[in-house]
């Protein structure tokens, strides 16, 4: 078939009209040095602070130092396959992690990728890891409790929804155990949990996941793992990634609890990155912005008001407040709470639970020191029953500690002093609690009622644990409906007081332990 010149001309014009050229401008640069997980890049003149830089290996680096003629970036993962001369390019976006209900029950890394071998995660979208915390106007005061299930914590240092309560102590004093038990106790409360493991052994994280699964709490929990074998960049970013996952629930009018285990290791990872980037070191070789590192993270834990939730969800959720409660963990060296990072985090949080190695070694577990443990806002959130009945506990323990110090030197003590010492010993014994055995509000109320109204006076010290077990068994068996109702309401009035009195009177009259 022959085409004449007119047809050829028309065909060419048609093809030209259909021809579509898309030009794409990309900001590229060249790696000039690679060392210890840090790369220096020449070029990238338009890169943003914190921007993701695409590497030729398929991984990403994060721009942290923007200098006059080069960019210092930290590699998100292994860096041994990178070399000088490789070309990299800007992505125009900052780090985002997947968020949503699909992450519940899963173990993910800092980037939100599954590492538990259970297949892909169906997420509801992505959220930036760095988000500005809610403002003053968007917040609401803390007045709802987060029950940890520990008598010592819920009675003396109560935690409210939206609070930041620091758990601080030396290594091997039960910090993680307390946080894990708090997560386990939320399995029926509707509070979603996020556990962020920073710089821990992979075997330790696996053990935590197994315990959560055994106790039926994993289905309600997201585990974000940045183990000791991960790069410093992933350890530094893990708490922010976990926080973004928790904010998904907070901003939709739900309650979430996040545990950072622990922020000491995150600070060490950030110090490592900063020193490798040649930022000037300050006290204990930490960079000058280590306070801001933790404050911008912990300020994101808040209770937000109904308007905030309604605006965020564009009217889909109305009349609901959301909260993100944070339990950061800090490890001290030889009980030194005046070190740089511990003092920073103490000043940022709304109180601290101080765990003491001396108490732990003496068998007092949880090893809470009631003298210096405090909750600055949790009192308003405490359930009425526990608040009313726990008033004398802290005083009894304070008097006991003071008298016990003098009693070491005095041989003959008067009856009143002896009675106070005996009462203090029994209260200390009663506040001991096994791991993975959280108590309900009603169970705590029964025990605190026994302390407050002298039902322990004729019980021998070595029989306190048996007394408690038998009492709770009796109360749950004979007054099931009342116990369930009290746990649900947390109220305290004359009727409840009389019922509790009846339970204890009947128990003391009819039981031996």
UniProtKB/Swiss-Prot annotation:
Enzyme Commission number(s): 7.1.2.2
Any Gene Ontology CC annotation: proton-transporting ATP synthase complex
Residue numbers marked as site, Required for activity: 373
Catalytic activities: ATP + H2O + 4 H(+)(in) = ADP + phosphate + 5 H(+)(out)
Subcellular compartments: Cell inner membrane
Binding-site positions, ATP: 169-176
Single annotated GO MF: proton-transporting ATP synthase activity, rotational mechanism
Membrane topology annotation: Peripheral membrane protein
Keywords assigned by UniProt, alphabetized: ATP synthesis, ATP-binding, Cell inner membrane, Cell membrane, CF(1), Hydrogen ion transport, Ion transport, Membrane, Nucleotide-binding, Translocase, Transport
Keyword Plastid among record annotations: no
A Pfam family it matches: ATP-synt_ab
Major localization listed first in the record, in broad terms: membrane
Alphabetized SUPFAM superfamilies for the sequence: C-terminal domain of alpha and beta subunits of F1 ATP synthase, N-terminal domain of alpha and beta subunits of F1 ATP synthase, P-loop containing nucleoside triphosphate hydrolases
PANTHER family xrefs: ATP SYNTHASE SUBUNIT ALPHA, MITOCHONDRIAL
Family (UniProt): Belongs to the ATPase alpha/beta chains family.
Function: Produces ATP from ADP in the presence of a proton gradient across the membrane. The alpha chain is a regulatory subunit.
Subunit structure of this chain's protein: F-type ATPases have 2 components, CF(1) - the catalytic core - and CF(0) - the membrane proton channel. CF(1) has five subunits: alpha(3), beta(3), gamma(1), delta(1), epsilon(1). CF(0) has three main subunits: a(1), b(2) and c(9-12). The alpha and beta chains form an alternating ring which encloses part of the gamma chain. CF(1) is attached to CF(0) by a central stalk formed by the gamma and epsilon chains, while a peripheral stalk is formed by the delta and b chains.
Name this protein carries in UniProt: ATP synthase subunit alpha
Organism name: Mannheimia succiniciproducens (strain KCTC 0769BP / MBEL55E)
Organism lineage: Bacteria, Pseudomonadati, Pseudomonadota, Gammaproteobacteria, Pasteurellales
Gene it is expressed from: atpA
């Amino acid at each position: 078939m022959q085409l004449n010149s007119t047809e050829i001309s028309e065909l060419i014009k048609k093809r030209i009209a259909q021809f579509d050229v898309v030009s794409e401008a990309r900001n590229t640069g060249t790696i000039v040095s690679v060392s210890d997980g840090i790369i220096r890049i020449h070029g990238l003149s338009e890169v943003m602070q914190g921007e993701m830089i695409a590497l030729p290996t398929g991984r990403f680096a994060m721009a942290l130092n923007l200098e006059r003629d080069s960019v210092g970036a930290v590699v998100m993962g292994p860096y041994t396959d990178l070399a000088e001369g490789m070309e990299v390019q800007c992505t125009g976006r900052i780090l985002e992690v997947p968020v949503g209900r699909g992450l519940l029950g899963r173990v993910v890394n800092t980037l939100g990728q599954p590492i538990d071998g259970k297949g892909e995660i169906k997420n509801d979208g992505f959220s930036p890891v760095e988000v500005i915390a809610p403002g003053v106007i968007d917040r609401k005061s803390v007045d709802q409790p987060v029950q940890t299930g520990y008598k010592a914590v819920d009675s003396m240092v109560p935690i409210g929804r939206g609070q930041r309560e620091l758990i601080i102590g030396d290594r091997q004093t039960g910090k993680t155990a307390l946080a894990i038990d708090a997560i386990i106790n939320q399995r029926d409360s509707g509070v979603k949990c996020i556990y962020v493991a920073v710089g821990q052994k992979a075997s330790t994280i696996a053990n935590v996941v197994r315990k959560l699964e055994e106790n039926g709490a994993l289905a309600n929990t997201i585990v974000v793992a940045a183990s000791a074998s991960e790069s410093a960049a992933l350890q530094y970013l893990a708490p922010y990634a976990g926080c973004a996952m928790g904010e998904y629930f907070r901003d939709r009018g739900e309650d979430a609890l996040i545990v950072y285990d622990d922020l000491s290791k995150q600070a060490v990872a950030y110090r490592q990155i900063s020193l490798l980037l040649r930022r000037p070191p300050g006290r204990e070789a930490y960079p000058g912005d280590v306070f801001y590192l933790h404050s911008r993270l912990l300020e994101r834990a808040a209770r937000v008001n109904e308007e905030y939730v309604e605006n965020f969800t564009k009217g889909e959720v109305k009349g609901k407040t959301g909260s993100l409660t944070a339990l950061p963990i800090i490890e001290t060296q030889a009980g030194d709470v005046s070190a740089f990072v511990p003092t920073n985090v103490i000043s940022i949080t709304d109180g601290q639970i101080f765990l003491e190695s001396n108490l732990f070694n003496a068998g007092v577990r949880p090893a809470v020191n009631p003298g210096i443990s405090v909750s600055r806002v949790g009192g308003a959130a405490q359930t009425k029953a526990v608040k009313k009945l726990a008033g004398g506990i802290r005083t009894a323990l304070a008097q006991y500690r003071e008298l016990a110090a003098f009693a070491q030197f005095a041989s003959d003590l008067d009856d009143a002093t002896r009675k106070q010492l005996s009462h203090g010993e029994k209260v200390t014994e009663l506040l001991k609690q096994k791991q993975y055995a959280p108590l309900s509000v009603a169970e705590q109320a029964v025990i605190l009622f026994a302390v407050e109204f002298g039902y322990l006076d004729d019980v021998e010290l070595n029989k306190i644990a048996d007394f408690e077990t038998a009492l709770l068994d009796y109360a749950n068996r004979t007054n099931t409906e009342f116990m369930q109702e009290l746990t649900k309401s947390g109220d305290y009035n004359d009727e409840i007081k009389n019922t509790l009195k009846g339970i204890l009177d009947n128990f003391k009259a009819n039981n031996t332990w």
